[in-house]
Structures are given as structure tokens and as C-alpha cells.
């Protein structure tokens, strides 16, 4: 459960209440939107609801990047960023930052019974250049005999890995952690960059427990049909047939075989919702691709049959209709027209693409 990001902090932390009340303010279309977040009581209710249905919720508190919302609430812990990604990082040079983040993780660990705790670690490069001139980070480099800000990032992640493990949790993080040489024991790597299959191979070769969740085809905020206009389309779209064909369709491209996957714990699809502003939009992007994900996760390649899957989907569509789920109907794309999404552009880089 991705509870924090640059755009918002969505969980109550008792010791640092401004994380939610200030870090939870605003959205893409209105920076003055009142704070929206989950109270710890609401979190407990959701966990109980999930447990009754045999679902385990794993929390993610992203660090040291994607910290803009948190830094709006407590700027004294900011490590800076860039014009495009302001106040993007936590300050890894301040000892107070480690106390602050440890206290946050203690509350998270006490709240969530899952043995896993995700602390992100992705895309720190978006803000790391600010560390080159930050006096606290520079003092850390000198004190610890480090040469580069990348080594400061490694220092930070090693310390926070120890914190997570001290709380009795297994660390989960994105595939950038492979560059930081975190220990293999009690660590799970989430491989998300489909255009960097070498990171998958490195994770498996080094013996890390690995979850495969590459953007293509498992990011469900990506467009799923050629005529859809809203959604990410960076280098193609993610149709249901590709989700069903995952992962065996890409073995040759990745340079792996089924026998290499002994360390893979499973697969995961990610639905990033910072630009999904209605329930219908979320449903439309998740269903029916979620059904293909489920079958891919529990089916060996030798027993997969896409035509039979499509036949079974007829019962799923009947259920979706009964539950009033606004799904994408690949049988008749006009059955549920594509819900409009916001169009967000930054300079020349398209963040949320719209196709005329």
C-alpha cells in the first residue's frame, strides 16, 4: 500500500501530525484541497477487512526520495531537490533525519501486522544533485570517508535497512537498491523497470528474493487499448493479452529462462492513482486486467490457454455487471466509454499523455 509520495502523505503519524494535516493537502488540480489521509483507526479497520478475506497489506513509506509532501510538513528534514522535483529528498546528512524516519517506521510497524515493510528507494536521482552542495550531506561524506553522494545514498539505505530489520520486518524496496549493495537476507527486490532487464538478472543471480512488476505490462495506469486517449503510453500500451502472457513471453528478451526464476516470490501489478480522479477511472484501468494478472500468477506457462481464459472471462463480466464495476470491455469498447483523465504536462516532458 503506497501510502506516501511526492504528491501526498496519506497516513496519520501520531508523533508527527503535520505529515498528514499538511503533507496530505492539495492535489494535481488544486493545491489548496483540504488534507486527505487515513487515520490510524481507519487503517486498522482496513487491515481487519483485508484479513477476513485472507489479504495481507504491506505498507510502503518511500525514502529517501519522493519526499516532497513530507518536507512540506517538516522542512527541517529536507535534503532538497530540483526545479522540476522540489524538496524531493530527505536529508541523509542529518542525524535528526534518522531519528525522525525511525520513529515513523516504528508507528508503521506497530500498525501493520505484515512481516514486510517497503521503504521505496526509487528514483532518488531526481533530487540527489542537491546533496552535492548541502553542508550536512557534505559533512557526512567527510565524516564517514565517502566519496560521492551516491555513496551517501548507500549509507542511508544500509542504516534504514538495519532499522527495518530491528523492527522484526523484512525489507522490501525497488530495484535501485541493487546499486546500493543492501544485504540479501531479509530483503526483497521489486523489479519494476522493464527497460532494464539486467536488474532482474542481477537480482536473481545475487540470490535476492524478487518480485516482478515491470511497467510493461504490469503498470495498470498505462493505456490498455489502441484507441484510448488518457493514460501513460510512454513506449506502448499494456493490453490484457500481454498481462496474461506475462512473464514467459519476455524470457528471451530479458535473457532469462524459467529455471532462473527460483528466487522469484511472485508478480505484482501497480496502479498509480495520482492522476486517477474518479472511482470509475480506477475500475476501468484495473478490470479486467486484474483477472489476467491472477491467472498469470498461479498458472505455469505450459497450462496457459488465452482462448480458454477469454471464455472464462464471460462469467467475470457477469459478476462485474452485478457489482456495478465500470470495467473496460474489450468485446465492445463502447460498452463503457473511456472515462476522461486529467492532462498534465511539465515543460517538454509529458507526464500524463493525451492523444488527439
Task: For the regions a language model picked out, list residue spans one by one.
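Substrate-binding cleft of carbohydrate-active enzyme catalytic domains
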Residues: 1-169
Amino acid at each position: 500500500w503506497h501510502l506516501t509520495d511526492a504528491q501526498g502523505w496519506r497516513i496519520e503519524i501520531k508523533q508527527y501530525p503535520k505529515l498528514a494535516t499538511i503533507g496530505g493537502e492539495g492535489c494535481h488540480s488544486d493545491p489548496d484541497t483540504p488534507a486527505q489521509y487515513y487515520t490510524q483507526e481507519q487503517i486498522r479497520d482496513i487491515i481487519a477487512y483485508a484479513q477476513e478475506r485472507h489479504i495481507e497489506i504491506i505498507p510502503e513509506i518511500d525514502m529517501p526520495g519522493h519526499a516532497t509532501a513530507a518536507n512540506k510538513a517538516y522542512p527541517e528534514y529536507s535534503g532538497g531537490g530540483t526545479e522540476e522535483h522540489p524538496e524531493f529528498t530527505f536529508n541523509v546528512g542529518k542525524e535528526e533525519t534518522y531519528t525522525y524516519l525511525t520513529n515513523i517506521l516504528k508507528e508503521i510497524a506497530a500498525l501493520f501486522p505484515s512481516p514486510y515493510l517497503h521503504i521505496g528507494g526509487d528514483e532518488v536521482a531526481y533530487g540527489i544533485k542537491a546533496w552535492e552542495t548541502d553542508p550536512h550531506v557534505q559533512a557526512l561524506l567527510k565524516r564517514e570517508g565517502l566519496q560521492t553522494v551516491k555513496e551517501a545514498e548507500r549509507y542511508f539505505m544500509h542504516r534504514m535497512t538495519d532499522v527495518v530489520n530491528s523492527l522484526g520486518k523484512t525489507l522490501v524496496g525497488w530495484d535501485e537498491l541493487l546499486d546500493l549493495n543492501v544485504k540479501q537476507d531479509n530483503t526483497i527486490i521489486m523489479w519494476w523497470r522493464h527497460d532494464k532487464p539486467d536488474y532482474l538478472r542481477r537480482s536473481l543471480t545475487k540470490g535476492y528474493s524478487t518480485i516482478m512488476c515491470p511497467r510493461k505490462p504490469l503498470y495498470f495506469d498505462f493505456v490498455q487499448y489502441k484507441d484510448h486517449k488518457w493514460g501513460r503510453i510512454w513506449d506502448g500500451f499494456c493490453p490484457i493479452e500481454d498481462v496474461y502472457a506475462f512473464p514467459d513471453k519476455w524470457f528471451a528478451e530479458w535473457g532469462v529462462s524459467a529455471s532462473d526464476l527460483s528466487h522469484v516470490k511472485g508478480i505484482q501489478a501497480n496502479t498509480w492513482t495520482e492522476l486517477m480522479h474518479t472511482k470509475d477511472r480506477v475500475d476501468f484501468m484495473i478490470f479486467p486486467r486484474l483477472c489476467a494478472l491472477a491467472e498469470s500468477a498461479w498458472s505455469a506457462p505450459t497450462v496457459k490457454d488465452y482462448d480458454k481464459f477469454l471464455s472464462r472471462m464471460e462469467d467475470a463480466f457477469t459478476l462485474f455487471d452485478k457489482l456495478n464495476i465500470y470495467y473496460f470491455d474489450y468485446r465492445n469498447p463502447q460498452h463503457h466509454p473511456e472515462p476522461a483523465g486529467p492532462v498534465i504536462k511539465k515543460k517538454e516532458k509529458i507526464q500524463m499523455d493525451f492523444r488527439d
